[in-house]
Amino acid sequence: MDELYSVRMRAAQGGPHENGGHHISGAERIVTLNQVGFIAQSLAERALHHSKGTADFINITVDLIPSETITYIDCLKVKEHTANTVTEAHQLAVKLLQGTDISESAIRNSIFLLKSLVSSMRGAMLVDAISGERLDAGNRGVRVSHMDSFDSDKLGDNEHMREALVLASKVQSAEGIVGELCWSDDPDYTIGYVACNGVYHRIPNMKEIGSNLGGRVFFVKPNIDLEGVIEYLEKEPVLVQW
C-alpha cells in the first residue's frame, strides 16, 4: 500500500487564529504522496475564494501517516429530512436526538449555545448529554482532524456532505460520544445535521440564509475520559469506508 499523508488547511482573515483572526475555512485530506501537491493547492484556493471572505492567513500542514496507525470505520447511514423553517428544523433535531442517552434539556441548551455564538468556532463544543453542561473551555473547541474517506466519488460533487459525513462518522465512532448537532458557518449553506445511533440525519433550514454563524456540539456521556476522547478526535488517523 502506498504511503499516506495528512494534508490539513486552516485559514483566517485578520491574521492567525491565535492572534484573533476571523476563521474563514478549514479542511483536510488523507492522500498518497503523488496527490499532496494538487490537494495542497486546491485547499489554498478554497481559502482564497470562500463565501466568508478572502483569507490573509493560510496554514497548510503535511504529515506522513504510518499505515499501522490508521483506523478504518464504516460510514454512517444517511437519512434525508424536510423542514420549512428554522424553528421546524430545530424541533426536528430535538426529536431525532432525544432518547435514553441524550436529554431534551441538553439538546435545547446546545441549540441555545450555537444560536448565542458571536463568532464561529474552529472546533466543536463538548456537552454533557444529560445535564447539558458545556465541558470544554474557551473559543477553540475540539477540532476533529486526521480523517478522510475511500470512494468519495459515490457522493458526486457534494463536497459539503462528503466532509460532514466523514467528520460525523469519526465523531460517532469515539467511545462515549452519543450524538452530534451541527449547522455550517457558510452563509450560503443552510443545511445542517444531527448524528446519533449510527445515522446521519440531514436537515434543511437549520439557520437563516446569509448567517455566517455556525458550529458543532458533541454530546458525551457523563463521567467519561474527556482527555482520551479529545485525543482520538484530534489526532487518531481515521479512514471512512462507504
Curated annotation (Swiss-Prot):
Instruction: Copy the pathway line from the protein's UniProt record.
Output: Metabolic intermediate metabolism; pimeloyl-CoA biosynthesis; pimeloyl-CoA from pimelate: step 1/1
- Can you supply a Gene Ontology BP term from the record? biotin biosynthetic process
Report keywords, A-Z: ATP-binding, Biotin biosynthesis, Ligase, Magnesium, Nucleotide-binding
Listed GO molecular functions? 6-carboxyhexanoate-CoA ligase activity; ATP binding; magnesium ion binding
Pfam families of this UniProt entry? BioW (PF03744)
Please write the reaction equations for the catalytic activity of this protein. heptanedioate + ATP + CoA = 6-carboxyhexanoyl-CoA + AMP + diphosphate
The UniProt similarity line reads:
Belongs to the BioW family.
Q: How does it assemble?
A: Homodimer.
Q: What task does this protein carry out? A: Catalyzes the transformation of pimelate into pimeloyl-CoA with concomitant hydrolysis of ATP to AMP.
This chain's protein is named 6-carboxyhexanoate--CoA ligase
- What organism does this protein naturally occur in? Veillonella parvula (strain ATCC 10790 / DSM 2008 / CCUG 5123 / JCM 12972 / NCTC 11810 / Te3) (Veillonella alcalescens)
